[in-house]
Amino acid sequence: KILTPQESYQSINWQVIILISALIPVGIVIQKTGTAGWIAGLISSATESVPFEWQPKVLLALIYFITIFLTEISSNAATAIIMTPISIAVAQQMGFDPRAFVFAVAFAASASFITPVGYQTNLMVYGPGGYKFSDYIRVGFPLAFIFWIMAIFILPILWPI
């Protein structure tokens, strides 16, 4: 069945559209005020003792970890909008190609498996499915960990850093 224009208009989730639209200025402010650069400096300084050849992967792992942590307590759109300028600033400060870092943010923000809070669908099945918070941690943490490890090794192959 093909949707009519009216049906397609009615199926739009306006709350998500409004949330993303409202958060885009937050991402711009983070970038324009220098906050992204400041946070990027903190993140980059965490890898000063790491050998240079490992710094790109360690930074990528750190960006992914921070993003996945935030996406578990916030919406994935909000997390991506906040972390994207920070990840770009980290890459630029270190002289790396930012594409792998941006994709790390995109993948991590979309991998909300550890809590029912981070993603709407998780919340929808949480109550009716009779799940406990610990069920999400038990199943979601190993899955998120596997995604994290895969991202650290695959993203630099696709977008060399």
Show where each model-derived region lies.
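Juxtamembrane and boundary regions of transmembrane helices in multi-pass small-molecule transporters
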Residues: M94, A106-I161
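Core transmembrane alpha-helical segments of multi-pass membrane transporters/permeases
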Residues: Y9-W38, K57-F69
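Membrane-interface interhelical connector segments
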Residues: W38-P56
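Short helix-coil transition sites and intra-membrane helix breaks within transmembrane domains
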Residues: V29-G37, F69-I82, A111-Q120
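Alpha-helix N-cap/start motif
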Residues: P5, P98-R99, F133
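Re-entrant/interfacial helical elements at transmembrane boundaries that shape
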Residues: W38-L42, A78-V90, V102, Y119-G130, ...
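Hydrophobic alpha-helical transmembrane segments of multi-pass integral membrane proteins
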Residues: V50-V90, M94, V102, A106
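Hydrophobic core segments of alpha-helical transmembrane domains in multi-pass membrane transport
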Residues: K1, S21-G27, L60-L70, I88, ...
